[in-house]
Amino acid sequence: MSLLTEVETYVLSIIPSGPLKAEIAQRLEDVFAGKNTDLEALMEWLKTRPILSPLTKGILGFVFTLTVPSERGLQRRRFVQNALNGNGDPNNMDRAVKLYRKLKREITFHGAKEVALSYSTGALASCMGLIYNRMGTVTTEVAFGLVCATCEQIADSQHRSHRQMVTTTNPLIRHENRMVLASTTAKAMEQMAGSSEQAAEAMEVASQARQMVHAMRTIGTHPSSSAGLKDDLLENLQAYQKRMGVQIQRFK
């Protein structure tokens, strides 16, 4: 796996699924391929994206700044600086300085990532802030190691939280989670269906599912009533894809 592929993988792992993730993936690909060279426009676009947390925007801004060639005097962006200040905690800043000194001695991506993984997310963000604000310099490879270590920590905590939700025994949370998944699956079906004649059936199924979820939420239903809703939808979607000659088995 090439370095940039690895960076793209780690960065995308912390972004919630949805159309925005697909858009960000495209921007990252363009930036890494040298197709997007207007850093100012890129940062303005990033700043106004909804849904993303300030830290995620800060990390993306840092990656764009590292990758896109820019004039020496180009202003640093406040939204990135604020996201990478370690919540203003002096402890984070102290640890970030210690980490920075260690990173100065590293020359490889993996070496830097290994060193960085033993620090807290706050310290890692502060260290990125130091480099972003030009208070310290490391090689691009080392900076990317720092980025990936930060993303790995964030993805780990997201995964733990997701696992807790999936394995919860609380029937109300499980019920709501099934309805949310059914709703997003229906949305994906509508987007994939396009405008062909065979698509009408898939669109109908998706529309009915969304109406059903809407009704269940409106009148309030027994927590077990949503069981199998998403699986039924996926079966319909896969049957539709088979007829269309498309084989995508990755939704489950």
Swiss-Prot record:
Main localization, broad class? virion
Q: Name one GO biological process term.
A: viral budding from plasma membrane
Q: Which InterPro entries match?
A: Flu_matrix_M1 (IPR036039), Flu_matrix_M1_C (IPR013188), Flu_matrix_M1_N (IPR001561), Flu_matrix_M1_N_sub1 (IPR015423), Flu_matrix_M1_N_sub2 (IPR015799), INFV_M1 (IPR037533)
Q: Name one GO molecular function term.
A: structural constituent of virion
Map motif Nuclear localization signal onto the chain: 101-105
A single GO cellular-component term on record: host cell nucleus
The organism sits in which domain of life? Viruses
What interactions and quaternary structure are annotated? Homodimer and homomultimer. Interacts with NEP. Binds ribonucleocapsid by both interacting with genomic RNA and NP protein. May interact with HA and NA. Cannot bind NP without genomic RNA.
* Task of the protein: Plays critical roles in virus replication, from virus entry and uncoating to assembly and budding of the virus particle. M1 binding to ribonucleocapsids (RNPs) in nucleus seems to inhibit viral transcription. Interaction of viral NEP with M1-RNP is thought to promote nuclear export of the complex, which is targeted to the virion assembly site at the apical plasma membrane in polarized epithelial cells. Interactions with NA and HA may bring M1, a non-raft-associated protein, into lipid rafts. Forms a continuous shell on the inner side of the lipid bilayer in virion, where it binds the RNP.
**Protein name as it appears in the record:** Matrix protein 1
Protein source organism: Influenza A virus (strain A/Swine/Netherlands/12/1985 H1N1)
- Supply the source organism's classification: Viruses, Riboviria, Orthornavirae, Negarnaviricota, Polyploviricotina
